[in-house]
Amino acid sequence: SRLRAANPHPTTELEYSTPFELLVAVVLSAQSTDKGVNLATRRLFPVARTPEAIVALGEAGLADFIKTIGLYRSKARHLIAACRMLAELHGSQVPADRAALEALPGVGRKTANVILNTAFGQPTMAVDTHIFRVANRTGLAPGKTVLEVERKLLKTIPAEFRVDAHHWLILHGRYVCQARKPKCGECIIADLCEYKGKTWPATEEMNKRSNGSTASDGATSHSTKSASGQVAAYPPPSPRTGGKTKRRATPAKTD
């Protein structure tokens, strides 16, 4: 896969060090940016990084740490309730089970998919706005609903790519196949894409591929040149900083 060649170890840009911290970050990320969530969790986690510690803060106390994030009051309420359930039913551990995850307040199918994939390495697909757009534009898995796209992606994508496909598609949608101004001239799969609204630099890139001047699928370069001649690197693997994995999960609405 070209996406794997460009980014062998894709990750989310949300910062976390345990499955519980990831759960908190993903719940907070709904209708919020990853940058905003990371700023909040950098304040929160040094003070409270377990379900018991979060509950001890209370809704008002937790809200103070996350008030820079949209819908922070409802998120604080959901997180307190979810933490109580984790402590009472799961020994304060995040379950690696879809039904148990979706039973937690504030956790729906998409959030559960992120946790199962990112924390536990399961081949799930959390379809957010980026994945939905890429799947429909490229023709990889066209669908009218999130669930339809999710099911088609899992059916279409070969097994060896499924665990990482979630992050590849999100990163591609966020940095290249953007909603308003897709960077088709920098796209490493432009010649495979069925999108009729390709921006003109894609034509040059597609011609290069058809003439054999671009690497094959399995050995695609990590960068491409835009129309201006500047090299645009495809999003590299996110660095690890301070013991925390910097990852970016796609925040859409809380499921």
Model-derived regions: residue spans:
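Intrinsically disordered, low-complexity terminal tails and inter-domain linkers enriched
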Residues: K208-A252
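Catalytic cores of DNA base-excision repair glycosylases
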Residues: S1-N207, P235-A249
